[in-house]
Amino acid sequence: MNKLENPLSHDVAGPAPRHKTTQVMVGDVAVGGGAPIVVQSMTNTDTADVAGTVEQVAALTRAGSELVRITVDREEAAAAVPHIRDALRKRGITTPLIGDFHYIGHKLLADYPACAEALDKYRINPGNVGFKNKRDSQFADIVEIAIKNNKAVRIGANWGSLDQELLTKLMDENAVSAKPRDVRAVTREAMVQSALLSAARAEEIGLAKNKMVLSAKVSAVQDLIAVYQDLASRSDYAIHLGLTEAGMGSKGIVASSAALGILLQQGIGDTIRISLTPEPGGDRSLEVQVAQELLQTMGFRTFVPLVAACPGCGRTTSTTFQELARSIQDFIRVEMPAWKTRYPGVENLNVAVMGCIVNGPGESKHANIGISLPGTGETPAAPVFVDGQKFRTLRGANISGEFKALVIDYIEQRYGAGVAAPVTVTAAE
């Protein structure tokens, strides 16, 4: 074989076939079993604050979150859950709610049956559901309540709260092994076993496989990839992907995207959450936007029109193309909730905003509608392309406003009738 030949190359670009998993219904949202990969998020409000939690769930839903997890950590939070659900429904929001339980989940669900009924899924952490002789009984209590209420369960192992008895057992076995493994490898094995043993126990109690989702989260990218590859190879439970404690800003976005992107490309993952630490006063909805953009840029789903824009260089000393790209992108995000109903299919739109003649015309032709703004020293004219054909040339001080109007016209023509239709291209000016 030629050294430059890629043995994995293929004629059709795309991810590996999806890992076959058992479908789980969380409320009315299908997870796994070939269903579209689901975006979920988590609030950071005090769940006992009904009004504040309702506002944040509503904001996350508007951003596109299809499942929302809320902390249920004490009696006041458990008592608030049905009121949160009811307030959301009064607003017409039916996004399934997931209760996040640690330490005393068995007690809260038993003492507050309205909470158990209002939630659509319970998250159990096998590392802290109970300790020593209480672990099995407290785990069983939650599973039995889930069965009684016909609810789904996520068994979510996390290496920050890993079952220490299991980890110690595996470490001791490894210490006397003829071929001892690296400590991190043993820890990964403990993560996978924690999830799988708990799932097997839940099935013994009577919880059906189509009621269970598994996760095994770590904060190191390479370890996360290895853990989920192992978990997927050893089971067909629906899988929730997430890099725990990903961090703030670009670091969190890059780390999560790197880890989840590789796993998704390998066909692993049925629902994802991007666990970003928000900036002080920052928008919690950013994690939803990043999750959507990851899935869309990889070709798994379409949520909003894509805006392609060049990075800029010495040929583009003008900031016009940057301002226009930002303006178009922000405009699309704001309008999408209304557009989803008014313009079915608009999420498939591609817009290009380019800054000079080098790649501008070519990239614009690849988009549904694109503009190539003049670079430094170039003729002060901006050709607009529609579906690969030159449509018009914009000049003057209001190029940005005119192009935005053309984008709106394109959307109305192509998607306004409820069915995607060709756009009439008049002679280029």
Curated annotation (Swiss-Prot):
Coiled-coil parts of chain: none
GO biological process terms held by the UniProt record: isopentenyl diphosphate biosynthetic process, methylerythritol 4-phosphate pathway; terpenoid biosynthetic process
Assigned keywords, A-Z: 4Fe-4S, Iron, Iron-sulfur, Isoprene biosynthesis, Metal-binding, Oxidoreductase
EC number(s) stated in the UniProt entry for this protein: 1.17.7.3
Top-level class of the enzyme under EC nomenclature: oxidoreductase
Pfam families registered for this protein in UniProt: GcpE (PF04551)
GO molecular function: 4 iron, 4 sulfur cluster binding; 4-hydroxy-3-methylbut-2-en-1-yl diphosphate synthase activity (ferredoxin); 4-hydroxy-3-methylbut-2-enyl-diphosphate synthase activity (flavodoxin); iron ion binding
Cofactor: [4Fe-4S] cluster
Functional pathway: Isoprenoid biosynthesis; isopentenyl diphosphate biosynthesis via DXP pathway; isopentenyl diphosphate from 1-deoxy-D-xylulose 5-phosphate: step 5/6
NCBIfam families: ispG_gcpE, PRK00366.1
Stated name of the protein: 4-hydroxy-3-methylbut-2-en-1-yl diphosphate synthase (flavodoxin)
Function summary: Converts 2C-methyl-D-erythritol 2,4-cyclodiphosphate (ME-2,4cPP) into 1-hydroxy-2-methyl-2-(E)-butenyl 4-diphosphate.
InterPro entries reported for this sequence: Dihydropteroate_synth-like_sf, IspG_bac, IspG_bac-typ, NO2/SO3_Rdtase_4Fe4S_sf
Catalytic reaction annotation: (2E)-4-hydroxy-3-methylbut-2-enyl diphosphate + oxidized [flavodoxin] + H2O + 2 H(+) = 2-C-methyl-D-erythritol 2,4-cyclic diphosphate + reduced [flavodoxin]
Sites where the protein binds [4Fe-4S] cluster: C310, C313, C356, E363
Homology family: Belongs to the IspG family.
